[in-house]
Every structure is written in C-alpha cells, then in structure tokens.
A protein has these predicted regions:
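Conserved beta-strand-loop surface patch within small alpha/beta domains used
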Residues: 2-115, 127-210
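Acidic beta-strand-to-loop metal/phosphate-binding motif
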Residues: 116-123
C-alpha cells in the first residue's frame, strides 16, 4: 500500500474529535432500521439487524455507552455446524475501538471467507465513517462490509461490491488524504472521509446511510 494508506490507524484515531458521548437509550435501540444491504445475501438481513441492535445494547449495558465492535462471519452456518464461534465482540473506550482486540474477531477476520464488522460510534458530529474505518475495510480483504451505528440509532454502511477494485480503492483513499492537507487536522480528517464516501462507488464500494 502507498505511504498515505500505510499510516498507523491509531494516529488517525487519535485525531478524532473529543465530543461528549451520547448515552444510549432504549428508544435509540428500538429505532434501528432493518436494511436490505446491497451485495449481502437476503438471508443475512435479519441477523445483521439483530447485531446492530446488539452493539447498542452491549454498549449501554456493559460498556458505559462507549464504543463497541461486533465481527460476524457470513460463514456462520458452517461454523455453527463445526461448533466454532462465529461472532467476536470487542469493547472500546469513549473515543475508539479496535475490532481485532477480541481474539474471536481476530480469528474470524484472519480465517473466514467473508466477515461483517459492525461498529458503534458515539460522536454523532463526526462523519459516520472515519478514515480509520475506511482504512480497516481496505486493509482486510475478507471484511466484506462495515456497518457504523451511532448512539442515536442511525446506520451507515460500506460494502464491497462485485466491481470492487483494491488498487483503485487505495488510490482513492490516498487522493482523499492528499486533497485535504494530509488529513492533519480534525476538519481535514472529516473532509477526507467525506470525499472517500462520496466517490466510493467509483472503486466498487457501495455506501448508504439511514
């Protein structure tokens, strides 16, 4: 990957705005929409809907409304048959979460064919996806989709489609960073992330928010 893409993700994460977090309510959990995700089997819609609710519930009940990431294998039926785990849960702090900090999630992302990573972000004033999120999606080939849920119950997602092109995606990522002062300041980080989201369709990544 090029130099911009190879920046340590923790550096990007540290530049995120330190807003006061929003405490999760039952109302936010109940308003999570059921989405017909592009390029994802219809049989998975309800599973992902349940997990999007779960990421809020876990954060509310077990992590003081801080960030949480759930990694879910789309090979779940096969893994269940084999008696293996198919969901990994990582608990983060107020500002970020590393999905790979959970050993099951790490194993799933390392070994299964396709995964979905569902992340709770609790700073609604930020872009729904951060550059760190985008970088994570591009870095791991078998992360098929990344879903961001906010503490207020809204959902956004990026999914790799049939025309997904990694080289073009990395070039777009670097272009987004270069066009925004190397993404050194908060506003630049947000603008770079927005630039990528706006143009993601050109590299075979579908973006939507609800």
């Amino acid at each position: 990957m090029t130099s911009s893409m190879s920046n340590d993700s923790s550096e990007l994460g540290m530049a995120k705005k330190r807003d006061h977090k929003i405490m999760i309510t039952e109302e936010a959990i109940n308003k999570i929409p059921r989405i017909k995700y592009r390029d994802i089997p219809e049989s998975e819609y309800d599973n992902i809907w349940d997990l999007a609710k779960s990421v809020l519930k876990i954060s509310k009940e077990e992590n003081d409304s801080n960030e949480v990431a759930i990694t879910y294998s789309l090979d779940s039926a096969k893994l269940i048959e084999q008696g293996e785990r198919y969901i990994g849960i990582a608990l983060g702090n107020e500002h970020d979460v590393d999905p790979l900090s959970d050993t099951t999630a790490y194993h799933l992302i390392s070994s299964t064919e396709e995964c979905v990573v569902i992340v709770l972000h609790n700073h609604p004033s930020l872009s729904d996806f951060s550059l760190t999120d985008v970088q994570f999606l591009l870095r791991y080939d078998n992360v098929k989709m990344m879903v961001v849920v906010t503490n207020l119950g809204s959902i956004s997602y990026l999914v790799k489609g049939k025309k997904y092109d990694l080289k073009k995606a990395i070039a777009l990522f670097n272009e987004a960073v270069d066009k925004n002062n190397e993404a050194e300041k908060l506003k630049d980080l947000q603008n770079a992330a927005d630039y990528f989201l706006k143009n993601s369709y050109t590299v075979g990544i579908d973006y939507d928010n609800r």
